[in-house]
């Protein structure tokens, strides 16, 4: 924004950094929250939102996975409890899996921040050996930001 002062931490060195921070979040350095932590959170939430937006579109277009209940105009929580009754082990396994991912990513984030040897969002998972470029990093940030807005719209609709 032309009338706002550009924050000192947003110097354009990160993908998607255009110096826009009207709330001054990039200047926070208390309680373990710094620019590294904020970028890690933005990437994580963007990735989850991209998956969520795709999942919503999939269910709307093709219906639920075989063996799982259909919403049929009911609230999604009613559908969740129906699924819980039919597939409690699958849901518990999903919760355990998500917990493990959160623990692993939390340790990686904390260690990467302390050592400086790990870029935010980099878990070393690249089985197809894609070349990581600045262009791809920018696309991931932009698509993640758009997906976060899209999921909010899908939930609100």
Region locations from a protein language model:
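Alpha-helical transmembrane segments and their helix-helix packing motifs
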Residues: 1-157
């Amino acid at each position: 924004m032309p009338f706002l002062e550009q924050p000192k931490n947003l110097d354009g060195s990160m993908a998607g950094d255009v110096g826009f921070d009207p709330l001054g979040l990039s200047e926070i350095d208390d309680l373990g929250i710094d620019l590294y932590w904020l970028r890690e959170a933005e990437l994580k939430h963007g990735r989850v939102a991209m998956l969520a937006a795709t999942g919503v579109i999939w269910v709307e277009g093709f219906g639920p996975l075989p063996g799982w209940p259909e919403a049929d105009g009911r609230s999604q929580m009613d559908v969740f409890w129906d699924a819980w009754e039919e597939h409690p082990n699958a849901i518990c396994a999903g919760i355990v899996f998500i917990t493990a991912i959160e623990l692993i990513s939390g340790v990686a984030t904390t260690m990467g921040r302390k050592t400086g040897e790990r870029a935010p969002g980099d878990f070393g998972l690249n089985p197809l050996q894609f070349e990581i470029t600045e262009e791809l990093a920018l696309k991931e940030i932009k698509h993640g930001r758009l997906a976060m807005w899209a999921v909010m719209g899908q939930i609100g609709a």
